[in-house]
Curated annotation (Swiss-Prot):
Binding sites annotated in the UniProt record for L-serine: 230-232, 284, 384
Localization (cell): Cytoplasm
Entry EC number(s): 6.1.1.11
Name of the featured protein: Serine--tRNA ligase
Length: 424
């Protein structure tokens, strides 16, 4: 959520920044006018209340003097009616301002590339060289079906489109991947957490999914509960409405969880395979940091995600997202894109973002600065470390052999009982 004080005092700069995210200047101008009206009304209310207090004191004195107070009582009643009317108007204005501040995206950091969409993203670096096959590589969905480890047909029968069963070594591979990821993140100082997979609406608001992106979620009918779209939601809300001790920062959390997404607006995109599902596993990283340290922590988090890909020997690239492609809550985002041979393309497998104080303001997560004793908003960061299903897809395609078998990456073999190959 944006700071109304920053918008008020640095309006032109904020408007310029948000314009790069597609926010119409007219929206901000309306917000500015409403905020000015609110402050004017507040001045009027305080003036009227002061007058009312004066009249009240005069009435009390008149009664002590046995004087007639009818006129003063009428005047006080008029003042009270004016205050009541202005308070009602203030409530309407506050609701409108809340709507503005909760539906506007975060202000992009100065280092974010300016652009309209993903075509304006900037590649930062690459790691690894895509493998050259001496045979036509298969898509991971064909490999999975031929190996008998991925079953979309029965997933569709049991549930519907974009659902599947993992079987045998496919299920073992999925489990090996997320256990490996959690172990690696643990080495980097992350505390492993098992979160609730259902959260309330306040939690969804805290991380920015609600109210703007309600259609992308699975709500439990007639309840205050939602299936989590990512473990970021419960992890980032862990300290909601709390004040932390500054000396304890930064704090690192990691969790593996299922993620549930309706994929509204994704009809026709990635209809086959593991890239876009309604339910998938993901290992998430979340950090709570002091503002002056948060961008250093973003670089570390991105490196933590890269470490997984490097140890799995999967070629990837790091991309800085443009202002027009970043997520709603992010001030800066790096995407990690892994090489998918059958698509001859890099596909997103992780997003690592610094939301600065955007989520912390919504969730009221603060810390007491040990230097000056003041209570301040901290910065929150989140990143995929990694999307597990997409990692399965990348391994199947990059490690496939001409006979249809798939070699298991060395880093995962200890998690698979020493198995080296998945054979038809």
């Amino acid at each position: 959520m944006l700071d109304i004080k920053r918008i008020r005092t640095d309006f032109e700069a904020v408007a310029e920044k948000l314009a790069t995210r597609g926010v119409d200047a007219a929206v901000l101008n309306e917000m500015k006018e409403i905020d000015a009206k609110r402050r004017n009304i507040l001045v009027k209310v305080e003036t009227l209340k002061a007058e009312r207090n004066t009249v009240s004191a005069e009435i009390a004195q008149a009664k002590r003097n046995k004087e007639n107070t009818d006129d003063k009582i009428a005047a006080m009643q008029n003042l009270s009616a004016e205050v009541k009317a202005l308070d009602a108007e203030l409530a309407e204005i506050d609701a409108k301002l809340t709507e503005f501040t909760t539906t506007l995206p975060n202000i992009p950091a100065d280092s974010v590339p300016v652009g309209a969409d993903e075509d304006d993203n900037v590649e930062v670096r690459r790691w690894g060289t895509p493998r050259e096959f001496d045979f036509e590589p298969k898509a991971h969905w064909d490999l999975g079906e031929d190996l008998g480890i991925l079953d979309w047909e029965r997933g569709g029968k049991v549930t519907g489109a974009r659902f599947l069963f993992y079987k045998g070594l496919g299920a073992r591979l999925e489990r090996a991947i997320y256990n490996f990821m959690l172990d690696e993140h643990g080495k980097e100082g992350y505390t492993e957490v098992i979160t609730p997979y259902i959260v309330n609406h306040d939690s969804m608001f805290g991380t920015g999914q609600y109210p703007k992106f309600k259609e992308d979620t699975f709500e439990l009918s007639d309840t205050n509960f939602v299936l989590i779209p990512t473990a970021e939601v419960p992890l980032a809300n862990y300290y909601r409405d709390e004040i932390l001790d500054g000396k304890d920062l930064p704090i690192y959390f990691t969790a593996m969880s299922p993620s549930f997404r309706s994929e509204a607006g994704s009809a026709g995109r990635d209809t086959r395979g593991l890239i876009r599902l309604h339910q998938f596993h993901k290992v998430e990283m979340v950090k709570f940091a002091k503002p002056e340290e948060s961008y250093e922590e973003l670089e570390k988090m991105t490196a933590n995600a890269e470490n997984i890909l490097q140890k799995l020997n999967l070629p990837y690239r790091v991309v800085a997202l443009s202002t027009g492609d970043m997520g709603f809550s992010a001030a800066k985002t790096y995407d990690l894109e892994v090489w998918i041979p059958a698509q001859n393309n890099y596909r997103e497998i992780s997003s690592c973002s610094n939301t600065e104080d955007f989520q912390a303001r919504r969730a009221q997560i603060r810390y007491r600065d040990e230097a000056d004793g003041k209570v301040k908003l901290l910065h929150t960061l989140n990143g995929s470390g990694l999307a597990v299903g997409r990692t399965v897809a990348a391994i199947l395609e990059n490690y496939q052999n001409e006979d249809g078998s798939v070699t298991i990456p060395e880093a995962l073999r200890p998690y698979m009982g020493g198995a080296e190959v998945i054979k038809p």
